[in-house]
Amino acid sequence: MHPYLISIGSFHLPTYGTMLAIAVLAGIYTAIRLGRRVGVDSALILDYSSWVILVALIGAKVLLIITLWSYYRAHPEEIFSYATLKLGGVFYGGFLAALFFTIWYVRVRKISFWKMTDVLVPSVALGTAITRLGCFSAGCDYGKPTTAPWGVIFSNALAHEATGVPLGVRLHPTQLYESATTLAIFAVLLWWSPRKKHDGDVFLGYLGLYAAGRFLLEYLRGDENRGFVFHHLLSTSQFIALLVLAGISGVFIWRRVHGSEKASALSEGSSTEFSQVAGANAGQRKNSRGNHKAKRKMQNSKPV
């Protein structure tokens, strides 16, 4: 565990901040590459990224403050303190803020929401995988005690002071679990992108995969300051993950119903058109036979 990547005198380069910067750059690069394949302009991606990063950081902080409201209500001066700034934030807070911003952005720029989000979510998955490595180095988002041989023991006093991670105790490396999970999701999304049937499939797939993975991983988390609901039955992120899964189910049901109605309408329209064409052809054949009989009758008649 190395909270600081570089320390020279009084200068300290935080490992978490460094990994976050790498995640942002890697995410922008990936989004630009994917956007080119489907006709999304690179300049648009860069403009969007310059705004959404700030929005996501603010959203992550806001949800962090909400989940720890009992503390911040008693210490309101800490809301804008340097200590709060160093805490990072809650992923879903940043994601939801970015999502609402994206809805506004695509309306203003008059582009498809589904196409845009299909381009963006692989970058989100990759960025999360990289950022969680920074979490591991800083000691935040640590796991519960375990006897598993792959458990990790943290020993850095600075990390303990900053994040509260227990020292000298074997813990689940939940940061690495989530990093591996989101890296796998990233690979699935890259494979899926050129094979999708509809715009929005990749976006919805990401939401479902991450929500399911995050819901399960939360059971292994040991940090108690991430917020809970329903008398500690679910963490804040688990509750949001369930809402996301419910929302995705609703979208798929809506798509299935409306897709079936559209297919039925097309089928009925095709049947009607076929009947009209068939009737017209039958009429033409009948007229043709009538004309042929009349012609033969005229040929067989004798002049008086």
Language-model segments: which ranges?
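A feature for loop-to-transmembrane-helix boundaries and adjacent hydrophobic helices
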Residues: M1-N291
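Arg/Gly-rich low-complexity intrinsically disordered repeat tracts
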Residues: K293-V304
